[in-house]
Amino acid sequence: MIVNGTEKSALLLMAIGSDQAGEILKHLTPFEVQELITAMVNIKRVSAQKLNEILLQCYNLAIKNNAFNCNNSDKYLIKMLTKALGEKKGTSLLKEALEIRNARICIKALNYMKAKQVAFLLDKEHPQIITTILICLNKNQSAEVLSFLSDKKRAEIILRIVDFHGIEESSLVELTQVINNLLKNKKLILSEKGGIKTAAQILNSMKIKHEKEIIENISKSNEQLADKIIKEIFLFENLVDLDDKYIKILLENIEKEKLHIALQNTSQAIREKFFKNMSHTESNELTLNLEKKSYISDISIKNEQKLILIMLKSIVENGRISLKNLREYYV
C-alpha cells in the first residue's frame, strides 16, 4: 500500500519512464534520491483504483489513460539512475538499495521457518544479534523463538529489547550476512533430529556423574520424561556395537550367574557378543544354561542388565570397574 509522499513520488517516477525520471532526479539531493530508490525497490503491485488516486494528485502531469506499467525492474532503475547520476554513482546507489531490500526479504523468511529451528540457528550468536533479528520478525514468531532459548538468555534478550533504539538499514545487510554464514559455514541440519533417542545417545557418551546430574535435574521438573530417557539409555541391545575389549574386561569381573540372568530373553546377536569373548568351554556351558527353561522375573533380568551396562560404562571411562560408579547406578 502506498502510504506516504516518498512512495507516491517513487510510483510517479516509475510511471513516466527512465528518461524523464532521470532528468527529475538530477534536481534532487543525494539523500532524496536514495529515499526514492529505496521506496521503488520495495513497491509491490498497486490496484488501478489506487493508482488513479495517486496520479490524479499530480495535477501538473498529463494523464492519458488508466493503464500503468509499474516498472521497477533492475534494468529500468539502473537506466534511470545512470542518466541522473552517472554510471558509477547510479550503480552504487541501486546496489545499496537492492541489498537493503534483499536483507529485509532474508530476515522476513525466518518468519516462515519453524521457531525451534530459528532458535537452534541463533542460539550461539551474540545476544545483541539475536535481539535485533527477533525485533525484525513477527511478534508471534519472536515469542515462540524466545521460548526455545534458555531462561538466562531470554531474560537478557528482553532487557536488550527494552533498551533497543532502532537499527540502521546498513545493519540489515550485516544481519543477512550473519544468517547466510550460519547456514553456510556451520552446515546446520535444520531438521527434526531431536527426541528421546538422541538425548539418550548423547547422555550415553557422558561420564556417569554428569549423566546422573542431568537426569536428576530433568526429573525435578518432568519425572515421566526422565524415566523415558533412562529406559532409552539402558538398552541392552546397544552392547552389540561395543568394542570387544570392554566385554572381555567385564567377563573377568562379573559372576557367571548374573550374566546368565542378564542374557535371558535376549537376541542371538547379544548372546554371540559375549560367547565370542569367552572360552569355548564357558560359552558352551552358558549356552546350555540359557536353553533350559527358567522362571526368572523380568525385574531381575532388567536389574542385572542395568548393572552390566553400568559396569561397562565404568570400564569405558576408567579402563576398569569402579565401585564408586557402581554405587551411583540408577535404581
From Swiss-Prot:
**Keywords, ordered alphabetically:** Bacterial flagellum, Cell inner membrane, Cell membrane, Chemotaxis, Flagellar rotation, Membrane
- Write out the annotated subcellular location: Cell inner membrane; Bacterial flagellum basal body
- Predominant location: membrane
The highest taxon in the source lineage is Bacteria
Give the bilayer topology: Peripheral membrane protein
Per the Swiss-Prot or TrEMBL annotation, the motif Part of the EHPQR-motif is positioned at 125-128
Molecular function as annotated in GO: cytoskeletal motor activity
From the record, what ranges are coiled-coil? none
Instruction: Please name the GO terms of the biological process aspect recorded for this protein, alphabetically.
Output: bacterial-type flagellum-dependent cell motility; chemotaxis
Question: Which residues bear the site annotation Part of the EHPQR-motif?
Answer: R160
What Pfam family is a match, any one? Answer: FliG_C
Q: Which Gene3D superfamilies does the UniProt entry name for this protein?
A: 1.10.220.30
Q: Which GO terms describe its cellular component?
A: bacterial-type flagellum basal body; plasma membrane
UniProt lists the family membership as follows:
Belongs to the FliG family.
Describe the task this protein carries out.
FliG is one of three proteins (FliG, FliN, FliM) that forms the rotor-mounted switch complex (C ring), located at the base of the basal body. This complex interacts with the CheY and CheZ chemotaxis proteins, in addition to contacting components of the motor that determine the direction of flagellar rotation.
- The protein here is known as Flagellar motor switch protein FliG
